[in-house]
Regions:
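Phosphate-binding/catalytic loops
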Residues: 1-38, 128-199
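Short beta-strand scaffold positions
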Residues: 118-119
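Alpha-helix capping/helix-boundary segments
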Residues: 123-124
Length: 199
């Protein structure tokens, strides 16, 4: 049982948080973090704790779909690198995170049309708190684009390779499904809009 939990949810705590998130979803408490205006999204911003594992992988995976992307960590230092287990897991998935550098919240500039995609319910609440009354951005749970939905994507940092790989598989699936829902967040579309404004 422990091996199964560790490979699917990271730890017992990961399992408990996943179950609690599903319970919140079932009673409608996560409705504020649904994507309500996909056509208004101009950039996908992936968010996790340190911006060196989950959001780093999501960032580089989203680039493969031509999305206009950014990423940040809620508790990190700008310039931090992904740890060796994250680099190895990403490499097994065909992604190179060697060039990735973390960005902290103070060093991040929010833009109108940003869609913040967090990994955990508590992160969704924290991002919304930091954004204040801004109504030109949205906050969603990335795991809602998993099949089945995973409102809690537990942090793989310091955990074993099996869960690292499982977590990144879920992030990859979510990003793939998400990319189909963001018609106006493509890099080419963004560049074209900027070009029209400059004329």
């Amino acid at each position: 049982m422990k091996i199964w939990i560790d490979s699917h949810y990271g730890t017992w705590r990961g399992l408990v948080r996943a179950l609690l998130a599903r319970a919140e979803l079932a009673v409608g408490r996560l409705r504020p973090f649904a994507l309500h205006q996909p056509e208004s999204v101009r950039r996908a911003v992936f968010v996790c704790h340190g911006n060196i594992c989950r959001s780093a992988f999501a960032h580089h995976e989203a680039l493969r779909y031509g999305l206009n992307v950014a990423s940040l960590g809620l508790s990190t230092s700008t310039g931090g690198r992904s740890p060796a287990p994250a680099l190895a897991s990403a490499a097994r998935a065909g992604l190179d995170l060697g060039s990735h550098r973390a960005t902290s919240w103070p060093d991040f500039k929010v833009q109108s049309g940003d869609l913040f995609l967090v990994m955990e319910v508590r992160q969704a609440h924290e991002i919304r708190r930091r954004l204040g009354n801004r109504d030109d951005v949205q906050v969603c749970l990335l795991g809602m684009w998993c099949k089945p939905v995973m409102p809690h994507l537990h942090d793989p940092y310091t955990l074993g390779d099996p869960y690292f790989d499982r977590c990144f598989e879920r992030v990859r699936q979510a990003v793939r499904n998400l990319s189909a829902d963001l018609p106006n967040a493509r890099i080419a579309d963004t560049q074209e809009r900027l070009g029209r404004k400059a004329v």
